[in-house]
């Protein structure tokens, strides 16, 4: 493989491993943190990206 092919393969692998984050909605800087309805802990941003309507953290969900 030549250098151009190596670079293309490296970029493709980086995109597959890291995921394509261009289409993930990001919270604005002024958005207040979302708190758990059960214990009041702040919900992690990665949880909110996967489940935008999440109300409970994984500690409270695990106790159910």
UniProtKB/Swiss-Prot annotation:
It comes from the Viruses. Its main location: host cell. It is found in: Host cytoplasm. This is Uncharacterized protein gp24. Keywords: Host cytoplasm, Late protein. Induction: Expressed in the late phase of the viral replicative cycle. Expression of late genes is activated by the viral late transcription activator C. GO terms for cellular component: host cell cytoplasm.
């Amino acid at each position: 493989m030549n250098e151009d092919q190596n670079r293309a393969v490296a970029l493709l692998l980086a995109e597959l491993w890291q995921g394509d984050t261009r289409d993930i909605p990001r919270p604005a800087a002024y958005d207040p943190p979302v708190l758990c309805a059960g214990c009041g802990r702040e919900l992690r941003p990665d949880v909110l990206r996967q489940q935008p309507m999440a109300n409970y953290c994984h500690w409270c969900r695990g106790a159910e």
